[in-house]
């Protein structure tokens, strides 16, 4: 198979191809990230409609950007993040995530050390799909346990997900993601 990525810098005339495509489609130029971010924040405000939002934050790009966006849109008093240490990351990575988020000014992020639970459930499991299911189920179990421990009333709190659309497809569509 062949893949072609006109968006990367080393593609000859990639920008020109995009420009021609946009011209053919009659697309109006003028899009900018600032306007898009504001549109997303307005959408978040409408969907949250006075409720608070809870989000699992891995420290990766997707969930970190979602956490930042939620905080900007709703304010930190209406957003709570939870980082789950699953014991499967690099040494001290969870501490690094928490330190980074603190440096960025986020005081509304908690951590749950569930490493022993994850590792005990994965012990002796060799098949990748079984591991994936166990990890996913354990994240859900820890999330449920932590939301109960934190006293998050489902009538007052929404659950947000920081992911990109292709990940929802990979995990079987939006039903399982």
Can you annotate each of these PLM segments?
Residues 1-157, 163-177:
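RNA-binding accessory domains that recognize and position tRNA/RNA substrates
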């Amino acid at each position: 198979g062949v893949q072609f990525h006109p968006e990367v810098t080393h593609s000859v005339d990639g920008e020109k191809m995009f420009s021609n495509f946009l011209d053919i489609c009659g697309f109006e130029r003028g899009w900018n990230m600032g306007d898009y971010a504001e549109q997303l924040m307005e959408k978040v405000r409408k969907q949250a409609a006075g409720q608070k939002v809870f989000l699992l934050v891995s420290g990766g790009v997707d969930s970190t950007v979602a956490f930042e966006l939620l905080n900007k849109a709703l304010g930190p008093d209406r957003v709570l993040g939870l980082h789950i240490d699953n014991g499967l990351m690099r040494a001290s990575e969870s501490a690094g995530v928490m330190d980074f988020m603190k440096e960025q000014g986020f005081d509304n992020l908690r951590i749950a050390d569930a490493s022993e639970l994850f590792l005990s459930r994965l012990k002796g499991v060799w098949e990748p799909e079984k591991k994936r299911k166990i990890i996913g189920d354990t994240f859900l179990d820890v999330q449920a346990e932590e939301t109960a421990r934190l006293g998050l009333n489902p009538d007052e709190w929404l659950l947000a997900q920081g992911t990109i659309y292709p990940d929802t497809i990979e995990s079987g569509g939006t039903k399982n993601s």
